[in-house]
Design a protein with these regions (language model features):
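RNA-contacting regions in translation and RNA-metabolism proteins
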Residues: 1-43, 52-53, 57-76
Length: 76
């Protein structure tokens, strides 16, 4: 799951080397804290949150086969 998030976000940002993803594992929930360069923050979030919402939808669809819930948080 972490690799998929990283692959998607690296395709959006200008500075892919600045991406950090921390994973917190719960019983049925996976939380991913994504940190990107401040310049790329707007690209990841997108206009009115469309990009991050789309990323969350894709990741949640992939997590359904494992009966997991995924939360993606953008942190600074």
């Amino acid at each position: 799951m972490k690799e998929l998030i990283e692959l998607i976000i690296k395709g959006i940002v200008d500075k892919p080397d600045e991406i950090e993803i921390n994973q917190v594992i719960g019983a049925k929930t996976l939380i991913f804290e994504v940190k990107v360069d401040p310049i790329d923050l707007g690209k990841v979030i997108g206009k009115q949150g469309r990009n991050i919402k789309s990323i969350r939808t894709i990741i949640n669809a992939a997590a359904q086969k494992d009966n997991k819930r995924v939360i993606i948080e953008i942190v600074n």
